């Protein structure tokens, strides 16, 4: 919006450019000149690219400003001129890089005598470096023409900006071919030898330091770019020169020639440390001194090791007699003989040499007893942690490289040939020569534990520190590194590759020393490690703003919350009990399951009326079961889920219901079975079977219609009903036990009225005198007779009650119920159990019943005892597994069924049908 409505103020640069005699300084006084230049204001660029303006800009960055100017504005114009020349505008870069007169004017800055102005030198280096990146070929060709360029550059090497310019020539030239050309040109100019010559005691410290830093950067840049540029086959010539033995020897000669100065020694050792650094295999990860990639570095730096080995005695002497230093005041007092930077770098060099694992160097260090000297310095300078770290690295290198050597021997032997000794040849290769003596690493380990007395020194230093602390003194500053050294020894003693060797050394100690070491490891060191492993996070000092008992008082007490039992959302607390998993057989494919679900839930439009009737009933039952399960009731068993998916669609087409298994119920019968169950006494008499093949009358069929009994239920023996896992509904009034609940939809009992003229409830009926339901929430009451007349009155009801003495009705909400033996007379009343899902039939014995679902079959068979009472079973979904005996199961069937089965007398006695008669009427 700012630019859209032209709210920006017009730059004053354009107004100045419209003037006839505008000067460069007037434009540079404007604050927005750099923004206008980067925005490529054409009028401004045309003005700046004039020859006079370009010469003036170059003079500003190469000549010292007048001394009489105010200091705060003295370098204002040189700084602005440098920014204008290096603002990455192609027009300015081309104008400066292609004009040789401007380049000569810029190059004249190197003709000055040192020291150069550091700020102007930075302007010059930045401008030349930008030209090298933008106009590489032109600038390189121009510099090559200058024979004294390298000499003049090294003359001002004491200025850090000129050292940066040298590194730009080495690393910032593109493409690769041109870069190799520049490297060869610099190598021909002997830039490496000249830099090494600058590391000399007679040179200035700044020149020595910058020369050393330049050599270190050349080493690192050469190795990094060599690993990144995989297409480069030709090695870096500068790196090859640096790694040559002659160059290393010349450097060491300059370091120890004549009077030794700390700056010269430190600068030279920095270059040696850079040469001994492990070579990086790439940008994926760094290869440390313990990795497998170190051998490649050793093979490259073998000339370095050969050049260093003759000078090890000089480094040992340096550790003994360093350059003299004055006493310094520290926080713990005056240090009369400081360790010094030279000895610290000497210790770093010893650690780096030990990491190379060169046998010749190891043997020379053992001969010189350098490790013993380093341990002396370790315990002498107790507050120099830099030294402590290097000594720890030396010990770790000795132990770790012994491990690597033994691993190499194990991998090289095939079990048949005698192990070979690995001896280095200086280039990282192993010479497999038979030997009886121990490898060099073991020699170094022996020297460390026997000659240097590492164990005794650890114990003595620890005991001395304990005495000091007991007397009220401070804990020594090297105790942390001493603990790590002791842990490294213990680790290699227990499971390290030099375990046997160290164990032998420990056993060779005097008895008192060995006992002290064992006690130290088992008690003192273990306790120290335990204290060191304590997590310091979330300590008391980090929560000082909190009170001590904040955690105890945080939150609310239980009594502050209201009881949630009466909450309407309390049932949803058990939402986690809902099982959303539909387990299917592993053999059933997903497509078959999907089709089964579709056929189970969706009915075709050409279904018969009776199928819709049974479907409505099952849907209501299933909905009620799911409602219970949602509020914590037990879930339907796994078999129900599988059978419902597999047989749901087919069972409805054949007039049967989906098999449902609940705890304690028998397995469902075959959906194609048409005959009713037979008892064991069927062979003794004729069985009368009722077949229900006629269409169902929609007016007489109700959702509470009874289910038939399958043969599989008869085949299964009675089983004990398990009631565990069922929900308890004692907290509220169950709907099944309500006297004023909804009337049963059964046509058999719907027209029966009570004494007051109202309709009596008509639940489904089952024999059983006073058997409570499985959940023990039912009430015992008198039940009406099996069937009733629509014209019955209250008086007839009372008469029926008298005839039905002893009969009870068990109204429950479960699937199964425990019942008692039925009455012995045909006039016995009917006990019935009303369930939301199915009809429960009472067996004729005290054994618990077992109910399941099966196709609609009604069978009448003579009882075993020959009683005139026939066994009548009418159901379509529930089967009762009962033992042989008289059974009368009266369901909520239509009056037509009762008329077909037998004649209803005035006193409501049912006459049995003749044997062999078949019932084909509607159910």
UniProtKB/Swiss-Prot annotation:
Residues 430-441 have a biased composition (Polar residues). Pfam families: SAPS. Keywords: Cytoplasm, Phosphoprotein. Strongest expression in bladder and lower levels found in heart and pancreas. Very weak expression observed in all other tissues tested. The keyword Repressor does not apply. One of its GO terms (cellular component) is cytoplasm. The modification Phosphoserine is found at residues 289, 746, 796. Residues 409-441, 662-685, 743-766 are annotated as: Disordered. SUPFAM superfamilies: ARM repeat. InterPro entries: ARM-type_fold (IPR016024), SAPS (IPR007587). GO terms for molecular function: protein phosphatase binding; protein phosphatase regulator activity. Signal peptide: none annotated. It is found in: Cytoplasm. Protein phosphatase 6 (PP6) holoenzyme is proposed to be a heterotrimeric complex formed by the catalytic subunit, a SAPS domain-containing subunit (PP6R) and an ankyrin repeat-domain containing regulatory subunit (ARS). Interacts with PPP6C and NFKBIE. Interacts with ANKRD28. Belongs to the SAPS family. Regulatory subunit of protein phosphatase 6 (PP6). May function as a scaffolding PP6 subunit. Involved in the PP6-mediated dephosphorylation of NFKBIE opposing its degradation in response to TNF-alpha. This is Serine/threonine-protein phosphatase 6 regulatory subunit 2.
């Amino acid at each position: 919006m700012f630019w859209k409505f032209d709210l920006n103020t017009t730059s004053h640069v354009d107004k100045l450019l419209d003037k006839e005699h505008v000067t460069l300084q007037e434009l540079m006084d404007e604050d927005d000149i750099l923004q206008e230049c980067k925005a490529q204001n054409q009028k401004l660029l045309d003005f700046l690219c004039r020859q006079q303006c370009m010469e003036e800009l170059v003079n500003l960055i190469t000549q010292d400003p007048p001394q009489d100017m105010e200091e705060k504005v003295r370098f204002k114009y040189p700084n602005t001129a440098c920014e204008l020349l290096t603002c990455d505008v192609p027009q300015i870069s081309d104008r400066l890089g292609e004009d040789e007169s401007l380049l000569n004017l810029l190059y004249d800055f190197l003709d000055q005598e040192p020291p150069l102005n550091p700020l102007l030198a930075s302007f010059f280096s930045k401008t030349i470096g930008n030209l090298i990146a933008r106009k590489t070929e032109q600038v390189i060709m121009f510099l090559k023409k200058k024979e004294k360029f390298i000499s003049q550059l090294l003359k001002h090497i004491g200025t850090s900006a000129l050292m940066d310019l040298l590194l730009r020539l080495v690393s910032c030239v593109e493409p690769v071919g041109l870069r190799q050309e520049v490297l060869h040109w610099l190598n021909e100019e002997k830039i490496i030898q000249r830099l090494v010559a600058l590391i000399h005691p007679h040179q200035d410290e700044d020149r020595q330091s910058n020369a050393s830093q330049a050599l270190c950067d050349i080493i690192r840049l050469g190795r990094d770019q060599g690993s990144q540029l995989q297409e480069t086959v030709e090695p870096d010539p500068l790196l090859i020169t640096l790694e040559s033995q002659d160059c290393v020897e010349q450097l060491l000669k300059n370091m120890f020639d004549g009077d030794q100065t700390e700056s010269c020694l430190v600068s030279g050792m920095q270059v040696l440390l850079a040469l001994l650094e492990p070579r990086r295999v790439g940008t994926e990860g760094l290869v440390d001194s313990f990795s497998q990639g170190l051998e490649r570095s050793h093979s490259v730096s073998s000339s370095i090791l050969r050049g260093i080995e003759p000078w090890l005695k000089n480094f040992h002497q340096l550790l003994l007699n360093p350059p003299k230093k004055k006493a310094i005041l520290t926080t713990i007092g005056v240090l009369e003989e400081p360790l010094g930077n030279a000895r610290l770098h000497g210790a770093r060099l010893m650690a780096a040499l030990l990491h190379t694992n060169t046998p010749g160097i190891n043997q020379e260090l053992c001969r010189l007893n350098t490790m013993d000297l380093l341990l002396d310095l370790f315990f002498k300078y107790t507050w120099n942690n830099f030294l402590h770290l290097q000594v720890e690295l030396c010990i770790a290198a000795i132990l770790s490289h012994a491990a690597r050597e033994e691993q190499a021997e194990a991998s090289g032997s095939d079990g048949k040939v005698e192990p070979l000794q690995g001896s280095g040849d200086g280039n990282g290769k192993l010479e497999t020569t038979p030997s009886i003596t121990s490898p060099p690493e073991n020699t170094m380990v022996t020297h460390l534990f026997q000659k240097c007395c590492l164990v005794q020194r650890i114990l003595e230093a620890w005991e001395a520190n304990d005495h000091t602390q007991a007397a009220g003194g401070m804990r020594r500053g090297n105790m942390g590194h001493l603990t790590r050294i002791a842990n490294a020894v213990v680790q290699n003693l227990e499971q390290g590759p030099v375990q046997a060797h160290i164990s032998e050394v420990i056993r060779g100690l005097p008895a008192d020393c060995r006992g002290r070491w064992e006690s130290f490891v088992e008690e003192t060191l273990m306790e120290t490690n335990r204290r060191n492993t304590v997590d310091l996070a979330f300590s008391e000092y980090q929560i000082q703003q909190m009170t001590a008992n904040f955690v105890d008082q945080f939150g609310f007490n239980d009594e502050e919350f209201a009881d949630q039992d009466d909450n309407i959302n309390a049932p949803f607390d058990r939402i986690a009990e809902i099982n959303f998993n539909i387990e299917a057989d592993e053999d059933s494919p997903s497509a078959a399951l999907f089709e089964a679900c579709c056929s189970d839930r969706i009915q075709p439009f050409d279904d018969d009326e009776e199928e819709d009737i049974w479907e409505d009933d099952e849907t209501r039952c299933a909905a009620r079961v799911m409602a219970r399960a949602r509020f914590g009731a037990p879930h339907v068993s796994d078999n129900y889920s599988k059978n419902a998916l597999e047989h749901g669609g087919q069972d409805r087409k054949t007039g049967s219901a989906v098999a449902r298994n609940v705890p304690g119920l028998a397995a469902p019968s075959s959906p194609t079975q048409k005959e009713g169950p037979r008892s064991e006494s069927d062979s003794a008499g004729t069985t009368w079977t009722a077949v229900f093949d006629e269409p169902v009358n929609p007016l007489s069929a109700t959702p509470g219609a009874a289910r038939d009994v399958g043969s599989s239920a008869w085949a299964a023996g009675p089983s004990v009903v398990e009631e565990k896992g069922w929900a308890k509904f004692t907290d509220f009034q169950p709907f099944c036990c309500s006297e004023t609940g909804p009337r049963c939809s059964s046509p058999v009992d719907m027209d029966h009225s009570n004494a007051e003229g109202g309709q009596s409830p008509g639940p489904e009926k089952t024999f059983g005198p006073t058997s409570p339901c499985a959940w023990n929430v039912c009430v015992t009451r008198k039940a009406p007779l099996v069937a009733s007349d629509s014209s019955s009155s209250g008086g007839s009801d009372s008469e029926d009650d008298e005839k039905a003495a002893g009969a009870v009705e068990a109204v429950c909400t479960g699937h199964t119920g425990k019942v008692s033996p039925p009455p012995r007379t045909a006039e016995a009343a009917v006990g019935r159990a009303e369930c939301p899902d199915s009809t429960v039939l009472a067996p004729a014995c005290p054994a618990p019943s077992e109910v399941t679902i099966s196709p609609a079959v009604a069978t009448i068979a003579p009882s075993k005892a020959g009683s005139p009472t026939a066994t009548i079973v009418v159901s379509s979904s529930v089967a009762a597994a009962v033992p042989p005996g008289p059974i009368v199961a009266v369901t909520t069937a239509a009056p037509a069924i009762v008329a077909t089965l037998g004649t209803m007398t005035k006193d409501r006695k049912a006459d049995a049908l003749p044997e062999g008669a078949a019932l084909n009427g509607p159910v």
